[in-house]
């Protein structure tokens, strides 16, 4: 029987508005459509994709804390919290689970305040500016890294 691995997908503030908010920047696909497609892709690799979206920093921090013993990898689009939340940074450092930071838009070509992320330097990697495709690249990379680690531990 193949081992089942778990990836946590975290979406921060305003990402619940995907498909409706600034479609020229974020596209027309809803968060529900995106997570459905990602879940389907993950399942083909025997990965269980867990998802949370919250506009509340404390909810995201609690979810991160509760992931310590059952999540193998995290994919996070912290939205605006990327630029403001040292608390999210500390939560991710505290659980020591590798993560990939994703941004739909290229944060380096937008307003100056968006060009700094408190998460980037502690992440395994950052994907930005690739639209929703960035989530799929992050998922594939996380799966590849999980599988590599699991074969090394056998």
Swiss-Prot record:
Q: Which GO terms describe its biological process?
A: amino acid biosynthetic process; aromatic amino acid family biosynthetic process; chorismate biosynthetic process; quinate catabolic process
The UniProt catalytic activity note for this protein reads: 3-dehydroquinate = 3-dehydroshikimate + H2O
Q: Which CDD domains match?
A: DHQase_II (cd00466)
Source organism superkingdom: Bacteria
EC numbers: 4.2.1.10
Which Gene Ontology molecular-function terms are recorded?
3-dehydroquinate dehydratase activity
Query: Which residues are the active-site ones?
Result: 26 (proton acceptor), 103 (proton donor)
Cite the InterPro entries for this sequence: DHquinase_II (IPR001874), DHquinase_II_CS (IPR018509), DHquinase_II_sf (IPR036441)
The UniProt annotation places substrate binding at: 77, 83, 90, 104-105, 114
Enzyme class (EC, first level): lyase
Please indicate which residues carry the site annotation Transition state stabilizer.
21
Pathway assignment:
Metabolic intermediate biosynthesis; chorismate biosynthesis; chorismate from D-erythrose 4-phosphate and phosphoenolpyruvate: step 3/7
Check the record and name the PANTHER family matching this protein: CATABOLIC 3-DEHYDROQUINASE
Q: Which NCBIfam families match?
A: aroQ (TIGR01088), PRK05395.1-1 (NF003804), PRK05395.1-2 (NF003805), PRK05395.1-3 (NF003806), PRK05395.1-4 (NF003807)
Q: What does this protein do?
A: Catalyzes a trans-dehydration via an enolate intermediate.
Tell me its family: Belongs to the type-II 3-dehydroquinase family.
Quaternary structure, from the entry: Homododecamer.
Q: What is this protein called?
A: 3-dehydroquinate dehydratase
Gene of origin?
aroQ
């Amino acid at each position: 029987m193949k081992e089942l691995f778990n990836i946590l997908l975290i979406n921060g503030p305003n990402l619940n508005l995907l498909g409706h908010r600034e479609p020229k920047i974020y596209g027309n696909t809803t968060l529900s459509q995106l997570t459905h497609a990602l879940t389907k892709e993950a399942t083909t690799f025997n990965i269980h994709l867990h998802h949370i979206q919250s506009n509340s920093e404390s909810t995201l921090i609690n979810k991160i804390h509760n992931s310590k013993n059952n999540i193998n990898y995290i994919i996070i689009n912290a939205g605006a919290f990327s630029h403001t939340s040292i608390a999210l940074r500390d939560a991710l450092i505290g659980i020591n689970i590798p993560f990939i930071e994703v941004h739909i838009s290229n944060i380096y070509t937008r307003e100056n305040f968006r060009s700094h992320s408190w998460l980037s330097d502690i992440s395994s990697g950052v994907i930005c500016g690739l639209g929703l495709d960035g989530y799929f690249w992050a998922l594939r990379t996380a799966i590849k890294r999980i599988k590599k680690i699991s074969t090394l531990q056998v």
